[in-house]
């Protein structure tokens, strides 16, 4: 859709060949999504001695996103991880650098973590938020100039 906006294609115009080809490819792959299952039910029992949140943020030229997993440990030392939630955004039409998009992903992760913490009715032992961007880590640790 962003490509259509960039090219200023009107609603009654035919799609350019390259976009039409991409759309047909996407459409043909949709049925394969029925085969994907992700266990999302997070069961928290009294036997769990440790509850951790692990959040991940990442970005590309076209989008950025964040996801949060709940990692539980029971009395026998058995670990379990379940996806709690995720959120993504399409990169703005105004071109942003990859480091800036990575920073947007880190902000999205922080906001998502805040919402999750408000919803959970249990004590979380530790929270770990991850990014692969060393630039973002440096920005987050720097002193604000304002």
Give the label of every model feature segment.
Residues 1-47, 52:
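C-terminal reverse transcriptase regions that engage the nucleic-acid substrate
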Residues 55-81:
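Acidic, metal-ligating active-site segments
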Residues 108-146:
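RNase H catalytic domain
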Residues 1, 23, 27, 56-58, ...:
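Mobile genetic element proteins and their domesticated derivatives, centered on retroelements
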Residues 59-62, 69-71, 86-89, 132-134, ...:
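An acidic- and aromatic-residue-enriched active-site/binding cleft used to recognize and process polar
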Residues 72-104, 142:
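A short, polar/acidic, helix/strand-boundary loop motif
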Residues 52-54, 63, 82, 104, ...:
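Beta-sheet entry/capping signal
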Residues 45-52, 56-61, 97-102:
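Secondary-structure capping and boundary motifs in well-ordered enzyme cores
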């Amino acid at each position: 859709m962003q490509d259509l906006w960039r090219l200023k294609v009107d609603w009654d115009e035919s799609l350019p060949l390259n976009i039409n080809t991409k759309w047909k490819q996407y459409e043909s792959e949709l049925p394969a999504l029925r085969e994907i299952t992700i266990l999302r039910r997070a069961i928290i029992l009294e036997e769990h001695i440790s509850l951790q949140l692990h959040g991940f943020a990442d970005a590309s030229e076209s989008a950025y996103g964040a996801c949060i997993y709940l990692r539980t440990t029971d009395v026998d030392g058995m670990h379990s991880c379940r996806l709690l939630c995720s959120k993504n955004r399409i990169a703005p039409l105004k071109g942003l650098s990859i480091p800036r998009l990575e920073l947007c992903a880190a902000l999205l992760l922080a906001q998502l973590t805040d919402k999750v913490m408000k919803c959970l009715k249990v004590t979380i032992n530790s929270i770990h938020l991850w990014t692969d961007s060393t630039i973002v880590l440096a920005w987050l640790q720097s002193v604000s100039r304002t």
